[in-house]
Amino acid sequence: MSERIFIGVAWPYANSQLHLGHVAGAYLPADIFARYHRTRGDEVLMVSGSDMHGTPITIRAEQEGITAAEVAERYHQRFMASWPKLGISWDFYTSTATANHARTAQEMFLSLYEKGYIYKNTVCQPFCSHCNRFLPDRYVEGTCPHCKYEGARGDQCDNCGKPLNAAELLNFRCKNCGNPPEFRETEHFFLKLSAFEEELIRWVETKTHWRTNVLNFTLRYLKEGLKDRAITRDLDWGVPLPLPGYEGKRLYVWFEAVIGYLSASKEWAASKGQPNAWQKYWGGDTKSYYFIGKDNIPFHTIIWPAMLMGKGGLNLPYDVPSNEYLTTESQKFSKSRNNAIWVDDVLSRYGVDTLRYLLSANMPESSDTDFSWREFVRRNNDELVATYGNLAQRVLTMVCRNYDNKVPEYGELDERSLTLIEKTAAMLCETDKALYNCNFREAIRLAMALAQEANRYLDEKAPWKEIKVDKAAAARSLYVAMVALSGLRVAFYPFLPESSGRLSTYLGFGSELEKESWILKMPVVGQELTPPEPLFKKLEDSVVEEETARMGL
């Protein structure tokens, strides 16, 4: 029975390029999940967009001496160019700079305001007398009061993940000039999170299918007690507050950006000429998944659900499969540390499926995982080239050369051959279960294990020897190996769409796997094959030294 799946993916700040940490954290797992569900025949809507209004953008604009709009548009266009290179299959990708998004965000604000979930309050905010302005949260840095991390921001500590406000920081300073700010009174609007605390606890306690790290973090945060949070800032860049007399204030990005999932859905529907089509993905039995990095957990398991509860009539998240951090040399990817590995740069030298494979096999699902170029080369050469790619190349080459580019007659299969076919079918069932539950590392491990088993079968049967004395016996062995390849092209497709499409074409099935089902499709005798090209390329050991030198390590 088909399902309807909504996939919301974290919105990247349009202030820098994409690096591997971004891809492993949210974008690759979301794409894997979307491709998997489409192949199952499910209805899928996967949306995201560029976050154009965050303070990181205004900070960069000031550093470069240009407008925030210019910075945001520059990186939005770079993102748009990067997604196809990565094979990210958005149903719709937009930005927070659209009139549709501003309207949707303002409607959400007014709905919550009219219901009493947003209220005005006079608060003390950091004011830099040297810069002569109020400082939004990311313009203030200092030491986290919880974990003592010295690089915490005025909105959140990246080290321990706890949301903060600037007044909580120790040794705080203005990010722009380095001077300590003073605190002055200003009026802001607050989201009444405290009103949703008990309802959120009851709701989260039902989410036993969530990843343990996500569930525990959320419950711990909830049981510490929710504080109301300001949702406006003294800025001139962002979505204007939809109330008269507050022209100098904007909706703050953590409130505004999550509304992008809804505004993107509406924009997608309008682009299809069906303006109400978004509604089926936000109601009924649709399951909503949000793919994010761990620094965004509270915004998607507490704040966004509270906003949806207050608004009413919209589905709450079914799952928030947040990943931990991908690190290098045990440090989080960071431009300031000079250890970021930029996506466009990597893809200018290596195949997209090679990158997707390593990031999938090493995905930080429950704990931080470390990226290394040595592992990149080893896995490419040992697993993609020598195991999976070699299996496809030698089987299809032998069949094309010796059986006129067609699937041969294979006769009666022996027990060993039937066992491999059964294992292939079982692998598809097991990967189906793993992918359904967002266990991506397990799914790709199962697929590669089947490739290893198929190679063992081929080595035992040795069709290159059989063909010299018994062409029919060789045909049986090669046919069974093609059955294994047929299963592998499906299992690997969500992870490795480019090479899976080519393998599917070589096998005579065509390249559009999403038009099939998550089943083992048997090659038909006489089916036309295409002489194969290697699926993957071997990498030289020198790559390790060259790439670490590029990073200055």
From Swiss-Prot:
GO terms for molecular function: ATP binding; metal ion binding; methionine-tRNA ligase activity. A motif ('HIGH' region) lies at residues 12-22. ATP binds at K335. It comes from the Bacteria. A motif ('KMSKS' region) lies at residues 332-336. Binds 1 zinc ion per subunit. Is required not only for elongation of protein synthesis but also for the initiation of all mRNA translation through initiator tRNA(fMet) aminoacylation. Belongs to the class-I aminoacyl-tRNA synthetase family. MetG type 1 subfamily. NCBIfam families: metG (TIGR00398), PRK00133.1 (NF001100). This is Methionine--tRNA ligase. It comes from Dehalococcoides mccartyi (strain CBDB1). The lineage of its organism: Bacteria, Bacillati, Chloroflexota, Dehalococcoidia, Dehalococcoidales. The gene is metG.
